[in-house]
Amino acid sequence: MCIRDSCIPLKWSANKRDFEPNETNEYNQIEYHEEYLLFANELDDINRTLDSIHGPAKLINAVFIKLLAGCGVREHQDVPTGRENIFSKTRRYHIPIITNPKVYMKCLDTDYYLEKGNVYELENTKNHGVRNESDIDRIHLVIDRLPY
């Protein structure tokens, strides 16, 4: 396993524990990073498309995540720690940007190849991990949506 993958946040909710989208308070702010403006139209298009498939939702997180060649992320669960935890309320999607058939997303003891050109929903409260056995860096756009 490598030290850490790298990421470029575009839009990010600052508070993961007590996130309540219908309230505005210091713990509930969504940060818009400078890079967001470069992809705002595309993110809106993606969100509208997912609205038509899964119903309306607010896009609250968007981040590009790079997993270096030969690296991985150990299996883990993004465990809700309380009733208001963000992971118990959102739906997470992976959109492969650069990938390889030797990059494996493992979820509940099954390996998957997430192919470029598709959108995948990941229930991240379930056991999951990833390993990049290829010789290229993998890049995904990962978004979290909060259903209305």
Q: Where would I find each of the regions flagged by the language model?
A:
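Short, small-residue-biased leader/transition segments that mark boundaries at the very start
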Residues: 1-3
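Short, surface-exposed beta-strand-loop junctions and turns on beta-sheet-rich folds
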Residues: 81, 111-113, 137
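Extracellular structured ligand-interaction cores
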Residues: 59-61, 90-94, 102, 127, ...
